[in-house]
Amino acid sequence: MSYFPWLTIIVVFPISAGLSIFFLPHRGNKVVRWYTICICLLELLLMTYVFCYHFQLNDPLIQLDEDYEWINIFDFHWRPGIDGLSIGPILLTGFITTLATLAAWPVTRDSRLFHFLMLAMYSGQIGLFSSRDLLLFFLMWELELIPVYLLLSMWGGKKRLYSATKFILYTAGGSVFLLMGVLGMGLYGSNEPTLNFETSANQSYPVSLEILFYFGFLIAYAVKLPIIPLHTWLPDTHGEAHYSTCMLLAGILLKMGAYGLVRINMELLPHAHSIFSPWLVLAGTLQIIYAASTSLGQVNLKKRIAYSSVSHMGFTIIGIGSITDTGLNGAILQLLSHGFLGAALFFLAGTSCDRIRLIYLDEMGGISIPMPKIFTMFSSFSMASLALPGMSGFVAEAVVFFGIITSQKFLFLPKILITFVMAIGMILTPIYLLSMLRQIFYGYKLFNMTNSYFMDSGPRELFVSICIFLPVIGIGIYPDFVLSLSVDKVEAILSNYFYR
């Protein structure tokens, strides 16, 4: 057990500091913005320091763990802890949230509440990724929903209330199944709740009950990932939300579902995962094709990028279902890669739409000359998203490919069919992304309009884009830097999986 509560400080600091926003002097929005950015930077620096000096990469066990009694009557403990599986998403959360705060600079209406909600969301997400207690995991899952709902309903497009209501209905419905699974696993076989991950990992369940638990958790995660057909909230939400909120949704929120699928379903319920894994692979394969095909028909720029996110998450689902070291490492790599790429694409789409006051692709065209910097950055991230070699998207999808090909779970013919369909999806990806670039930046449609909104990207947009582009290139050139974080933990999960 850690003697200094590093993780407690990391989880509590953003929301605690966020409460102070309401007591800042009323001297305009600039004070609130700089205060929030400083809090995010301090949190990111603290995380980096703790993980560099107090985390051992070659140790697959839980590290920096803490255990404090919280509610005695329920035997509920505050149990944070991290391992190789959680350190990547936590660092991604800190990085993307800091940049999303900078991206939210133009927000002026209710600025204090907006930035407090971003910091509250920050704490909820880090708390979830560092939880090693089932009930704490559920509480952090719910804590993160409230700020997202308010961010969606108060800042965004004309249909923001509709999209926010749809989001909360889907996620709250999934949370019911998550709570039932948590309580079922915690109360099984004992008069006292056993909510600790380590205790639950050593618990044996009847196969039928394990399948029931697995299915309940899967529904909750299928909403967040999302898995078709529980994905319809995502395009509407992205289409109406402010682009800084979209960065948090695409960069972090979707990753929570995949993280829970590995952390709870795969690690704690291995027999049920073995039964469900072929269906996960099938769902992921169909999702790649369906979402890519649907994205091609979208005329709303943000919705097209949203469907591309759904398609790319299909590779993560396939990697998790492959039950191989390579496949699971590829799924984790795809999570981090898409976290960067999804956030960058929504940021650039939002800044572009703010400048030209248009959102529909058939109304755009010809803005590459007046906005060359945005054109260059948008094209670069689109190339990374369509898996151009040398960038993170290519490495992640290639590793998932090798994972499913080398899987012992599937026969030769199904593996050939799966890889063939995945290849079709990878062909559709450049079609809808390149056609999107053509509709936005090429042609002559907007040349005759006034150029009052055609100011190219400034230092803020360039800084955010370059900060995201560096890890995209870094992962593409040297993926072992990221894979080294999770490889030992992945081996530990799969060794327990096969020998239990």
Swiss-Prot record:
EC assignment: 7.1.1.-
Q: Report the InterPro entries cross-referenced here.
A: NADH_Q_OxRdtase_chain4, NADH_Q_OxRdtase_chainM/4, NADH_UbQ_OxRdtase, ND/Mrp_TM
Q: Which terms under GO biological process does the entry name?
A: ATP synthesis coupled electron transport; electron transport coupled proton transport
Q: Which Pfam families match?
A: Proton_antipo_M (PF00361)
Protein location: Plastid, Chloroplast thylakoid membrane
What the entry lists under NCBIfam families is as follows:
NDH_I_M (TIGR01972)
In Swiss-Prot or TrEMBL terms, this protein is called NAD(P)H-quinone oxidoreductase chain 4, chloroplastic
Q: Which organism is it from?
A: Acorus calamus var. americanus (American sweet flag)
